Every structure is written in C-alpha cells, then in structure tokens.
Amino acid sequence: MRIGYGEDSHRLEEGRPLYLCGLLIPSPVGALAHSDGDAALHALTDALLSAYGLGDIGLLFPDTDPRWRGERSEVFLREALRLVEARGARLLQASLVLTLDRPKLGPHRKALVDSLARLLRLPQDRIGLTFKTSEGLAPSHVQARAVVLLDG
C-alpha cells in the first residue's frame, strides 16, 4: 500500500476559463496557468507521482516547454496513472479538497465526481470531494489538495 499527496494553486483572473476535475465550470474568473490550470487534476497528478517518488508535474510537464501551453490537464493525469500502473499499482481511493471563494461549487458536485470517476476509473464511493472557501483570506486564487491510496 502506498499513499501519495499533491497540492496545487493558481491565481484567478477575470475572463479566463475555470477548469476543475476535468470540467469547464461556469465562472467569471479562471486560472492563470501555462496549461488549462485545472488545480484539482494537477494536485491528483502530483499525488500519484509522489506515491512512487516520480517527481512532480513540473518535472514531467515543465511550463518552460511550449508543448504544454494550453494543454488539458487530463493528459498529465493519464500519464501519471500510466506511470504508477506500470509499477504494478492500482488506485484504490482519491480524496480532494478544493478551496476557492467563487464560484460556489456545490451545484456542480455530481458532475465533478462523475468526471473524476471517469478519469480515475474508480467507483464514485471511492472519491472524496470537499469544498472550502478561504473565508476571504485569498479570494483571487484556487487551491487543491489531494491524497491517493494505491495498492502495489
């Protein structure tokens, strides 16, 4: 059994798209990032990689490489899954905490969990998804923290 932890954050700016858990969320603000800025998938990618000491998303997909400009974060997550599965691992569970002040994510919970279940190839009851606000401390950013449990 192995546990991995990952974390990611992005500044939010008016007029940019907001991707979370592989979905485009209706929002007046979105992540400033080299890729699509999906903090949830970036945190999950790092969590998977950390469980096997494989570095992090910046090592595998550096923001200095123009190939990754605007890339969907699903690409990064799929590669991290491939790398851990190549070591005989099987993802058992994933838990995420998303922190942002706006937009409110509650109305999108089912769609976000559905997307994670599809991307991670897990049943929905093996995905924890928690929403928090910064209580006004950091209203112009999104942060994601992820923990994964793997067998193998």
Curated annotation (Swiss-Prot):
Pathway it works in: Isoprenoid biosynthesis; isopentenyl diphosphate biosynthesis via DXP pathway; isopentenyl diphosphate from 1-deoxy-D-xylulose 5-phosphate: step 4/6
Gene3D superfamilies xref list: 2-C-methyl-D-erythritol 2,4-cyclodiphosphate synthase
Sequence positions that bind 4-CDP-2-C-methyl-D-erythritol 2-phosphate: 8-10, 34-35, 56-58, 61-65
Cofactor note: Binds 1 divalent metal cation per subunit.
E.C. no: 4.6.1.12
Assigned keywords, A-Z: Isoprene biosynthesis, Lyase, Metal-binding
Catalytic activity: 4-CDP-2-C-methyl-D-erythritol 2-phosphate = 2-C-methyl-D-erythritol 2,4-cyclic diphosphate + CMP
Function: Involved in the biosynthesis of isopentenyl diphosphate (IPP) and dimethylallyl diphosphate (DMAPP), two major building blocks of isoprenoid compounds. Catalyzes the conversion of 4-diphosphocytidyl-2-C-methyl-D-erythritol 2-phosphate (CDP-ME2P) to 2-C-methyl-D-erythritol 2,4-cyclodiphosphate (ME-CPP) with a corresponding release of cytidine 5-monophosphate (CMP).
Name of this chain's protein: 2-C-methyl-D-erythritol 2,4-cyclodiphosphate synthase
